[in-house]
Curated annotation (Swiss-Prot):
Its EC number is 2.6.1.9. It comes from Salmonella schwarzengrund (strain CVM19633). Its cofactor is pyridoxal 5'-phosphate. Gene3D superfamilies: Aspartate Aminotransferase, domain 1, Type I PLP-dependent aspartate aminotransferase-like (Major domain). InterPro entries: Aminotrans_II_pyridoxalP_BS, Aminotransferase_I/II_large, HisP_aminotrans, PyrdxlP-dep_Trfase, PyrdxlP-dep_Trfase_major, PyrdxlP-dep_Trfase_small. GO terms for biological process: L-histidine biosynthetic process. This is Histidinol-phosphate aminotransferase. The keyword ATP-binding does not apply. Keywords: Amino-acid biosynthesis, Aminotransferase, Histidine biosynthesis, Pyridoxal phosphate, Transferase. The keyword Glycosyltransferase does not apply.
Length: 359
């Protein structure tokens, strides 16, 4: 048998996948720490007991209790809610439903969350970037100049990793610019820490607005992998065409429904209040720490700070088992590290370690 035209497995793969640099998640980056402040998780576990023990049947595609509970919590109709394997799947579903590979583009504004880029690249969709302004707000002129051929614009508010809200008037301008041209995805993964800023009330006005949500942050369920897409019914119906038939396992749906009960939502709000209190403690302490140049305002469960020698600080804390998130490679974030708000004990360990750093 001739082997002249034999291809390796790598050769058989799509070119864009061969060239793809996968998203560097906190777990993928590894580390042997005992203080994990690099993934914006809630620092302590929340206990649940499974009430659904029947696992020999496939689950519902969109579990009724989860959809109805989330709709009530978010103040939208059940028909405007889709549940998925984390908000990350929601990102991918929107790109798959609206973007033609090799023809259409997505647009995002770095520094921001990395999965918009990775999801588009995986699917073979062009990625356009319009860097944020110096104050990390939207460059509306730059976005307007790049809308031809753009089908989806991603905006993270509050933005990860910078922590600030996007100006609501700028968001409204963006929605007017894109009306009839592109979908605007507002990533509200951290909205529970600033609920007054949600865009859910705008859905009736903007049929091309899509909102992403998650149970990973304030609901303390990062390990559950459960996210939500909020949009008008026409958009939801399109996303339902491309979602997997059984995106949520029965145990995930069971726990999600419990987390979204009135008691679960009250517990979440207590966690938010606790986190905001700890965030202020951490901010105050960082501002009085010699190796810290600047602490940026945050509306989230993490803090971005600029350090005099961020790389050595990052490694020093890593070696002490304190794992932070290095942001040096992000545009305009030279010298910056992101610190998840932990427990008081964890936060104090960070401060003590930073104050021991040479200046």
């Amino acid at each position: 048998m001739s082997t002249e035209n034999t291809l390796s497995v790598a050769d058989l793969a799509r070119e864009n996948v061969r060239n793809l640099v996968p998203y560097q998640s906190a777990r993928r980056l590894g580390g042997n720490g005992d203080v994990w402040l690099n993934a914006n998780e809630f620092p302590t576990a929340v206990e649940f007991q499974l009430t659904q023990q029947t696992l020999n049947r496939y689950p519902e595609c969109q579990p009724k209790a989860v959809i109805e509970n989330y709709a009530q919590y978010a103040g939208v109709k059940p028909e405007q809610v889709l549940v998925s394997r984390g908000a990350d799947e929601g990102i991918e579903l929107v790109i798959r439903a609206f973007c033609e590979p090799g023809k259409d583009a997505i647009l995002y504004c770095p520094p921001t969350y990395g999965m918009y880029s990775v999801s588009a690249e995986t699917i073979g969709v062009e990625r356009r970037t319009v860097p944020a302004l110096e104050n990390w707000q939207l460059d509306l002129q730059g976005i307007s100049d790049n809308l031809d051929g753009t089908k989806v614009v991603f905006v993270c508010s509050p933005n990860n990793p910078t922590g600030q809200l996007i100006n609501p008037q700028d968001l409204r301008t963006l929605l007017e610019l894109t009306r009839g041209k592109a979908i605007v995805v507002a990533d509200e993964a951290y909205i529970e820490f600033c609920p007054q800023a949600t865009l859910t009330g705008w859905l009736v006005e903007y049929p091309h607005l899509v909102i992403l949500r998650t149970l990973s942050k304030a609901f303390a369920l990062a390990g559950l992998r459960c996210g939500f897409t909020l949009a008008n019914e026409e958009v939801i119906n399109l996303l339902l065409k491309v979602i997997a038939p059984y995106p949520l396992s029965t145990p995930v749906a069971d726990i999600a429904a419990q987390a979204l009960s009135p008691q679960g939502i009250n517990a979440m709000r207590d966690r938010v209040a606790q986190t905001v209190q700890e965030r202020q403690y951490l901010v105050n302490a960082l501002q009085q720490t010699a190796c810290v140049e600047h602490v940026f305002d945050s509306e989230t469960n993490y803090i971005l700070a600029r350090f005099t020698a961020s790389s050595s600080v990052f490694k020093s804390l890593w070696d002490q088992g304190i794992i932070l998130r290095d942001q040096n490679k992000q545009p305009s974030l030279s010298g910056c590290l992101r610190i998840t708000v932990g427990t008081r004990q964890e936060n104090q360990r960070v401060i003590d370690a930073l104050r021991a750093e040479p200046v």
